Design a protein with these regions (language model features):
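Domain-level recognition of soluble alpha/beta enzyme cores
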Residues: 167-188
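Phosphate-handling substructures
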Residues: 22-30, 68-135
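Short catalytic/ligand-binding loop motif for oxyanion handling, primarily in non-cytosolic enzymes
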Residues: 12-15, 59-62, 81-84, 121, ...
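A short, acidic, amphipathic alpha-helical segment used as a generic capping/interface helix at domain edges
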Residues: 131-146
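Active-site-proximal alpha-helix that buttresses catalytic centers in soluble enzyme cores
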Residues: 2, 6-74
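Generic beta-sheet signal
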Residues: 3, 49, 146-156
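Active-site metal-binding loops of divalent metal-dependent hydrolases
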Residues: 9, 156-157
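Conserved histidine-centered catalytic loops in small-molecule metabolism enzymes
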Residues: 46-77, 101-115, 167, 186-188
Length: 188
C-alpha cells in the first residue's frame, strides 16, 4: 500500500500574491483546474483507494476533479498547517477551514471523518507540536490499516510536516511540492 500526498492546484488566493492571502475560502483558478486535470491522467485510482481531503474549498475542488467525489473523506487532520511552525506567525485567512456546518451546506453528501476531537474551529494550523504529532501519528496508523492506497490532498506546510513524521530529514520550504505536485511513499 502506498500513501501519496497531493498539493492542491493554483488557488485564487495566489492571484496578486501576497495581497489576497487574507481571502476567505479561495477556490481553484482556471490554471489550477487545468493542473489538476493533467495530474488526473497520472493517477490510477482503484475502488479500494481512499482520498483524505483538507476542509478547504481549493483542496475539495482538487479532490472532486480527481475523483468525481468517490472514496473522498474530509479530514481536519490534513488541513492547513504552517511550516515551519513559529508562534509569532499569524495564520492567513485563506487557511481557515470550513466548519462542519459550512461543509454540509457547500458540499452536501461528502463524507467527513470524525476525529473524535473539536478541531473544526482552529484546525491544526497553529496546534502545539506534540498534540499535532500524536494526532497525525494516529491518522497515519489508521491509514496503514486500510485496504487500498491512500491519497491525501492538502497544503504545502501540512504535507511537509507529515513527510517529516514519516522520516524525511532536513526538509525546508524549498521542498514544497508546488501546485498540483505529488509525493508518494511506497509500501507505506
Amino acid at each position: 500500500m502506498d500513501i501519496t500526498f497531493i498539493r492542491h492546484g493554483h488557488g485564487e488566493h495566489l492571484i496578486d500574491y501576497p495581497n489576497r492571502l487574507n481571502e476567505l475560502h479561495p477556490g481553484l483558478t482556471e490554471r489550477g483546474k487545468s493542473q489538476v486535470t493533467k495530474l488526473c491522467k497520472q493517477l490510477k485510482l482503484d475502488p479500494h483507494d481512499i482520498i483524505l481531503v483538507s476542509p478547504t474549498r481549493r483542496t475539495i475542488e482538487t479532490a472532486l476533479l480527481l475523483s468525481a467525489g468517490e472514496h473522498l473523506t474530509i479530514c481536519p487532520l490534513v488541513g492547513p498547517r504552517m511550516f515551519p511552525q513559529n508562534p509569532v506567525f499569524t495564520p492567513f485567512i485563506c487557511d481557515q477551514i470550513y466548519s462542519r456546518e459550512e461543509l454540509d451546506t457547500q458540499f452536501p453528501g461528502l463524507s467527513v471523518m470524525d476525529c473524535g476531537l473539536e478541531c473544526w474551529e482552529e484546525g491544526i494550523n497553529r496546534m502545539d507540536e506534540h498534540q499535532f504529532e500524536v494526532l497525525a501519528r494516529g491518522l497515519l496508523q489508521w491509514c496503514r490499516e486500510q485496504d487500498g492506497n491512500i491519497y491525501i490532498i492538502s497544503h504545502d506546510g501540512t504535507i511537509t510536516n507529515y513527510r517529516i513524521l514519516l522520516g524525511e530529514k532536513g526538509l525546508s520550504r524549498r521542498d514544497f511540492l508546488g501546485e498540483a505536485g505529488m509525493h508518494t511513499f511506497k509500501n507505506f
